[in-house]
Swiss-Prot record:
GO terms for biological process: mitochondrial membrane organization; protein dephosphorylation; protein import into mitochondrial matrix; release of cytochrome c from mitochondria. The keyword Plastid does not apply. Residues 143-286 form the FCP1 homology domain. It is a single-pass membrane protein. Signal peptide: none annotated. Belongs to the TIM50 family. This is Mitochondrial import inner membrane translocase subunit TIM50. The modification Phosphoserine is found at S341. Gene3D superfamilies: HAD superfamily/HAD-like. The chain crosses the membrane at residues 66-86. Residues 22-65 are mitochondrial matrix. Residues 87-353 are mitochondrial intermembrane. One of its GO terms (molecular function) is ribonucleoprotein complex binding.
Amino acid sequence: MAASAALFSRLRSGLRVGARGLCTRLAPPPPRTPEQVTEIANRGGSKAQGPQHQPGSEGPSYAKKIALWIAGLLGAGGTVSIVYIFGNNPVDENGTKIPDEFDSDPILVQQLRRTYKYFKDYRQMIIEPTSPCLLPDPLREPYYQPPYTLVLELTGVLLHPEWSLATGWRFKKRPGIETLFQQLAPLYEIVIFTSETGMTAFPLIDSVDPHGFISYRLFRDATRYMEGHHVKDISCLNRDPARVVVVDCKKEAFRLQPFNGVALRPWDGNSDDRVLLDLSAFLKTIALNQVEDVRTVLEHYALEDDPLEAFKQRQSRLEQEEQQRLAELSKSNRQGLSFGSLASRLWPRSKQP
């Protein structure tokens, strides 16, 4: 009993101590100063505005890294493949390697320099004409060489592309093509110089010229590529520039020699069009007047929106002036004739013995 009473008294004293400690812990904190309250509020605001972790935000970042790695590997593999393919020596028909100026370099340097040369030559092929002399030398006697050269664009000048769901792409012939060729072939060496590719333009030229009036054909690879335009450089034609006329629907096509060109409006497919007939009359007038330098004539029409219409108006005005001059001359002749008749009546000639 004594032991039980002692144990019970110890438990009661322990509970009292525990209750006293609990009351101490649950007691209210001491009052804070206004500065402490402001500091605590600022800390809480900065934590609330700080970066918050969003679930799943690591997923897109990981995917981007994987995509960049794959793109880098593909780019590196493509670069190595290009250098390997275009960096080897060219081979002949028997499969034997053809030596070049890069054989003395280390292998990697050889590959890189050959690849660079290949793409440089390819770019040069696109920008520059295929040859500094696009046409052969003029014909000599006993063969006939027309005194002038006429350079014609195909699309927009002679043909108009049309597309329909039933037929697809078709090219419509401009009215007056046959007349143009027949009247100008004896006076002009006719050359088709088009910005179209040879694969597209060759059969079209065959269709518009079944009688063979066209002397030569030049395609896109013969143009000079400048600022997004295919320019026709007359200096590469191997002909006297003073006797070359370029007909195109884009002034940029003859920008290097602006006074050698006649810019027409692009044909829209109208079947009542008569521009080629007017062009034939204009060029025929130049040739029949034996103009030494066509640039002196074409310079007057270079600033006109419609050179052929300006030529027709000037021609009509000259015809009216000529008719007026002839009328005045005829009137003066009639007056002179009537005066002579009156004088002969007043003073008859003496009869011969």
